[in-house]
């Protein structure tokens, strides 16, 4: 915490150069400081599910929370508030004043690369979860920068794509989560998106800023996404306060020239500088640590475990196969995710965790006397797993010259694995635009045989083992999707190795600009990156046979697989909803011999196809669960946690069923949001398409009974007076548990095309066995309103409305109704 300063005094005292310097960052994470006026540098930090700190490379470890869709699946305001507090506390430990989150874009397609970062396909649920996590974070003094405003709902050509969306869909679906934040949370900062909306980049569009500041009366600091500023004059005049990161590419001396040419007014510079100073004045009072460090307290671990367990969705549980008993003679654990948990997606969400609990280790804790058989069954990785536990004495040395020339060592950095991102790395004397590095280390395999190696790079790289070249990813390169869409495909090589023998590995690396690969529409963060992975070469058919044998011999089988950050990441979208190759075949083969005693655990941030689902008795959706992934899953499997989570998005049976299937790529620089307002369950219900699992679905180990009648008061609704819907619920099952009652509103008499029904409220209710409660859910003016494109206002239409209480969007258990006597138009929040 620094000394306070008076914004007016500083603004009136500083030079024009200082005012201009305030409008852009100084480096990857910090704003400009004016020490003589007590204006400190403000530190920002990623990411949506954790706090990385200031380093992508060799960073300080951090708490990794479950991913956005997992948080959304809790439908738990209080738990999200606690998650926000933890994120704020992590920021303070890292010396950061501003958390770059949460992400509240919409999953209009299950294929969006960052779909796992956002909370839900429904704007009400998304906005409500965002409100809770923001208020939690900002209660610590840390400012939340909600993102990405607006329309960055897919990664394909995200900097260049023109999102073509109707005003109604923009308002009702994509802007509404931000509108809820503006009304209920007032986060101190907002980040713009990379993309265009209807012909103009959001960052340069005055109309998009007017919605925030004039219509919603919300005045956050507005910053660009990283390298998401494209002009000097247009972005300044439109309303962008802060260009990130620094050093500036479009401000600085360019602003001076624009002012001299009277293309930017002095008053505009003063307005933007004032906003940055107000941001700094507030943020600097957060009690941030002077030294970047971690915390990893027992209470943090307990909270993370609670969040993970409460996020896990029980999709299917025929004949109450779950929960499993804790007295089991022999259990088979199958799948690479059993020992290598998927704790997060890729990109900004990826960080160095304090620790990661595997399902294997968690089950050993629960079943200390049980014989446990483990088989991989099939690989789920896209890139070979990074070398870590078999790596020793590894360092990276940095130079300004390539390896074939005489060169001067600039720095030496110890590393504990063979993956690195250097977008924000710097050391004295380093030429950031063009440099080279050498990674040296010792690799001691634990099994003899043929080992596969894979090398992916943003830049150039060559792998040597005992000075023999094994992979050349320098001479000829093929573009892939890694490293925010700028990397190569994985080039592979193989070498016969002996267990226990130590081999010298060496990677000769050239920074980003040594690569000839160019790409349109992706973000060029610079620096470069590389990923070296290794795995014992295995016969895939024999792996399946071994898994089948284990399942046939065990009393129970847990098959845990899915996606990971190789498949779901910032920088690219998925091409399909498929699980990794051979996974479906593995699951089918295991179900053939042990279907009556097998539980399928899927880890993914968004839906995957499950062609075997009708044959599986029990299916669990475990998302990306953070540090406590293994514990969270085991808690649900063995009944220590009664599952209560609900899907925050619809789960289509086939990728071709999803509403954005024909419009999920940038074509000719444009992407048509052809589904309009019919996103997610709104689409499936409108056309009568059955999903594999509906929005809001999730089972429990207990039973609930809800009174069939909803009492609505008052029965005549106006936009000035919210109404209340009251219903009774009882836990009629054998154990305590929670049910999430979802309130949908339908407008059957409306002359305007509308969804069959829309989520407008919810309540998570915890009940002991036999306990009964009265639940009251409030409904506000959003429930009866749609965006009138002719009047350019919200319209609450006269008519009869139905209140539908469901345990999912498909399972409606109670009904009521109310009327709106008079049509009303309104604006604002």
Swiss-Prot record:
Its UniProt pathway annotation is: Glycan metabolism; cellulose degradation
Chief subcellular site? secreted
Name its cellular compartments. Answer: Secreted
Enzyme Commission no: 3.2.1.21
Q: Which PROSITE patterns match?
A: PA14
Query: Where is this chain glycosylated?
Result: 416, 431, 473, 602, 627
Which GO terms are recorded in the biological process aspect for this UniProt protein?
cellulose catabolic process
Provide the GO MF annotations for this entry.
beta-glucosidase activity
Pfam families assigned = Fn3-like, Glyco_hydro_3, Glyco_hydro_3_C, PA14
State any GO CC term: extracellular region
- The record's active-site residues are 225
Q: Which reaction does it catalyse?
A: Hydrolysis of terminal, non-reducing beta-D-glucosyl residues with release of beta-D-glucose
Q: What keywords tag this UniProt record?
A: Carbohydrate metabolism, Cellulose degradation, Glycoprotein, Glycosidase, Hydrolase, Polysaccharide degradation, Secreted
- The residue ranges of the PA14 domain are 389-548
Q: Which family does it belong to?
A: Belongs to the glycosyl hydrolase 3 family.
Biological role stated in the UniProt entry = Beta-glucosidases are one of a number of cellulolytic enzymes involved in the degradation of cellulosic biomass. Catalyzes the last step releasing glucose from the inhibitory cellobiose.
PANTHER family on file: BETA-GLUCOSIDASE, BETA-GLUCOSIDASE H-RELATED
Protein name (database record) = Probable beta-glucosidase H
From what organism does this protein derive? Aspergillus clavatus (strain ATCC 1007 / CBS 513.65 / DSM 816 / NCTC 3887 / NRRL 1 / QM 1276 / 107)
């Amino acid at each position: 915490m620094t000394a306070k300063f008076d914004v007016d005094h500083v603004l009136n005292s500083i030079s024009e150069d200082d005012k201009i310097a305030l409008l852009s960052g100084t480096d990857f994470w910090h704003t400009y400081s004016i020490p003589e006026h007590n204006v400190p540098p403000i530190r920002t930090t990623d990411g949506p599910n954790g706090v990385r700190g200031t380093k992508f490379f060799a960073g300080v470890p951090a708490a990794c929370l479950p991913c956005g869709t997992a948080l959304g699946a809790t439908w738990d305001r209080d738990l999200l508030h606690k998650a926000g507090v933890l994120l704020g506390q992590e920021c303070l430990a890292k010396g950061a004043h501003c958390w770059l989150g949460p992400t509240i874009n919409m999953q209009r397609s299950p294929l969006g690369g960052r779909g796992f970062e956002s909370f839900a396909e429904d704007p009400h649920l998304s906005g409500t979860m965002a409100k809770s996590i923001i208020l939690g974070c900002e209660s610590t003094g840390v400012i939340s920068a909600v993102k990405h405003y607006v329309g960055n709902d897919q990664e394909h050509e995200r900097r260049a794509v023109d999102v073509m969306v109707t005003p109604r869909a923009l308002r009702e679906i994509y802007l509404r989560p931000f509108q809820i934040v503006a009304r209920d949370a007032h986060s101190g900062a907002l980040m713009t998106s990379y993309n265009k909306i209807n012909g103009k980049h959001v960052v340069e569009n005055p109309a998009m800023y007017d919605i925030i500041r004039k219509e919603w009366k919300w005045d956050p600091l507005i910053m660009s996404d990283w390298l998401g500023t494209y002009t000097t004059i247009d972005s300044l005049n439109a309303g962008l306060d802060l260009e990130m990161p620094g050093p500036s590419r479009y401000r600085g001396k360019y602003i001076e020239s624009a002012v001299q040419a009277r293309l930017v007014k002095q008053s505009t510079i003063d307005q933007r500088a004032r906003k940055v100073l107000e941001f700094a004045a507030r943020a600097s009072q957060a009690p941030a640590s002077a030294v970047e460090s971690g915390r990893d307290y027992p209470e943090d671990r307990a909270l993370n475990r609670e969040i993970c367990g409460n996020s896990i969705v029980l999709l299917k549980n025929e004949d109450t196969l779950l929960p499993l008993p804790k007295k089991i003679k022999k259990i088979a654990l199958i799948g690479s995710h059993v020992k290598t948990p998927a704790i997060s997606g890729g990109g900004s969400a990826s960080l160095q965790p304090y620790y990661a609990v595997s399902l294997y280790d968690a089950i050993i804790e629960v079943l200390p006397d049980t014989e446990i058989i483990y088989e991989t069954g099939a690989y789920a990785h896209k890139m070979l797993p990074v070398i870590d536990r078999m790596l020793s004495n590894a360092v990276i040395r940095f130079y300004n010259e390539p390896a074939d020339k005489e060169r001067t060592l600039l720095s030496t950095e110890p590393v504990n694995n063979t993956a690195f991102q250097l977008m924000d790395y710097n050391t004295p004397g380093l030429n950031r635009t063009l440099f080279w590095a050498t990674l040296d280390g010792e690799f001691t395999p634990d099994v003899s045989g043929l080992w596969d190696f894979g090398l992916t790079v943003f830049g150039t790289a060559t792998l040597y083992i005992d000075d023999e070249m094994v992979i050349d990813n320098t001479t000829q390169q093929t573009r892939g999707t890694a490293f925010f869409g700028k990397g190569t495909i994985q080039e592979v090589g193989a070498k016969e190795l002996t267990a226990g023998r130590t081999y010298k590995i060496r990677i000769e690396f050239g920074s980003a600009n040594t690569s000839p690969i160019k790409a349109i529409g992706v973000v060029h963060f610079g620096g470069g990156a590389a990923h070296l992975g290794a795995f014992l070469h295995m016969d895939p058919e024999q792996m399946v046979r071994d898994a089948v044998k284990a399942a046939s011999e065990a009393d129970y089988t847990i098959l845990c697989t899915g996606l990971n950050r190789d498949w779901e990441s910032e920088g690219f979208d998925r091409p399909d909803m498929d699980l990794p190759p051979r996974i479906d075949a593995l699951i089918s083969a295991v179900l053939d011999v042990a279907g009556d005693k097998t539980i399928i655990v899927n880890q993914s941030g968004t839906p995957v196809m499950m062609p075997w689902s009708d044959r599986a008795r029990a299916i669990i959706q475990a998302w990306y669960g953070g540090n406590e992934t293994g514990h969270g899953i085991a808690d649900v499997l063995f009944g220590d946690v009664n599952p209560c989570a609900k899907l925050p998005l619809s789960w289509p049976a086939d990728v071709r069923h999803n509403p954005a299937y024909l419009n999920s790529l940038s074509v000719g620089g444009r992407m048509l949001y052809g589904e309009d307002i019919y996103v997610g369950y709104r689409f499936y219900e409108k056309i009568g398409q059955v999903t594999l699992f509906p929005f809001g679905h999730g089972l429990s180990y207990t039973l609930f009974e809800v009174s069939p009648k909803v009492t609505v008061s008052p029965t005549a609704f106006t936009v000035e007076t919210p109404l209340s819907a009251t219903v009774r619920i009882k836990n009629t099952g054998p154990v305590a548990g929670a049910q999430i009652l979802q309130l949908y509103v339908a407008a059957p008499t409306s002359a305007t095309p509308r969804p069959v029904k829309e989520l407008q409220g919810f309540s998570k209710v915890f009940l002991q066995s036999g306990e009964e409660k009265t639940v009251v859910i409030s409904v506000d003016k959003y429930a009866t309103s749609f965006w009138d494109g002719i009047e350019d206002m919200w319209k609450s239409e006269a008519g009869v409305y139905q209140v539908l209480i469901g345990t999912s969007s498909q399972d409606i258990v109670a009904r009521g109704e109310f009327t709106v006597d008079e049509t009303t138009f309104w604006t604002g929040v």
